Design a protein with these regions (language model features):
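A structural motif corresponding to the C-terminal end of an alpha-helix
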Residues: 30, 75, 81, 122, ...
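Short, glycine-/small-residue-rich phosphate/pyrophosphate-handling segment
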Residues: 109-155
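Short, basic/glycine-rich phosphate-binding loops at helix/coil junctions
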Residues: 43-51, 127-133, 165-167
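N-terminal beta1-alpha1-beta2 submodule of the flavodoxin-like/Rossmannoid cofactor-binding fold
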Residues: 1-105, 181-195
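Short, structured loop/turn "capping" segments at alpha-beta junctions
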Residues: 103-108, 161-165
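Residue-level recognition of the N-termini of beta-strands and the immediately preceding loop/turn
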Residues: 34-35, 123-125, 163-166
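Glycine-rich phosphate/pyrophosphate-binding loop and the adjoining helix
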Residues: 138-195
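Active-site donor-binding loop signature of nucleotide-sugar glycosyltransferases
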Residues: 39, 84, 131, 170-172
């Protein structure tokens, strides 16, 4: 399977980088074709440019993100690895969606600018792996898993409704002992071995 791994954490080393390395190793060991994009290390610019926004309804200006678009269209599986900050993804990952999952690539607008028509028909699976400093009950019971909800409902259901979503959250990571890190790595390996 063609797997695109997208990592979004500014620090290296970090728990996200450790989890990303485990994911890449597991997928490579399983003989999947892999491409890895580390948004911070690659210098990805997250802000939608004025030219891109001006071209939104008339053939999106893709020059600056051509490689990222090529990777998106190549992928059958996407693995996202990122921290959750303020119960949302890092700005750089949000910017990746804003600039890469665009009209004519990830979806088409209806002629009347009504319902969106999905275009990412090759995408079969998305795996999101995120770390949070908060306890699980804040995410689940108070905020009702906002990152998962946006990814599934707003992004995947409109651009790739056939794609399944697996969402792994690791909580209270700022005080996670080594055995907790090992357990997270084992959980990721187990899940990715069965793609």
């Amino acid at each position: 399977m063609r797997c695109l791994i997208v990592t979004a954490h500014p620090l290296n080393p970090s728990l996200c980088q450790t989890l990303s390395n485990a994911a890449i190793d597991t997928l490579m060991d399983a003989k999947h074709q892999c491409r890895h994009v580390d948004l911070y290390r690659s210098g990805f610019f997250p802000a939608l440019t004025p030219a891109e926004r001006a071209s939104y309804y008339s053939g999106f200006e893709t020059t600056e993100v051509a490689k990222e678009i090529e990777d998106l269209l190549w992928a059958e599986t996407i693995v996202l690895i990122f921290p959750t900050w303020w119960f949302g993804p890092p700005a750089i990952l949000k910017g990746w969606f804003d600039r890469v999952w665009v009209p004519g690539i990830a979806y088409d607008h209806a002629a009347d600018l009504g319902a969106i028509q999905p275009r990412l028909r090759q995408l079969r699976k998305v795996v999101a792996i995120t770390t949070l400093g908060s306890p699980w009950w804040v995410d689940w019971l108070i905020l009702r898993r906002p990152v998962r909800r946006v990814l599934k409902t707003a992004i995947l259901n409109t651009c790739a409704p056939q794609a399944s979503l697996t969402f792994l959250s690791f909580y209270k990571v700022e005080s996670l002992p080594r055995q907790g890190v090992d357990a997270a790595i084992n959980r990721i390996r187990s899940m990715l071995q069965h793609l």
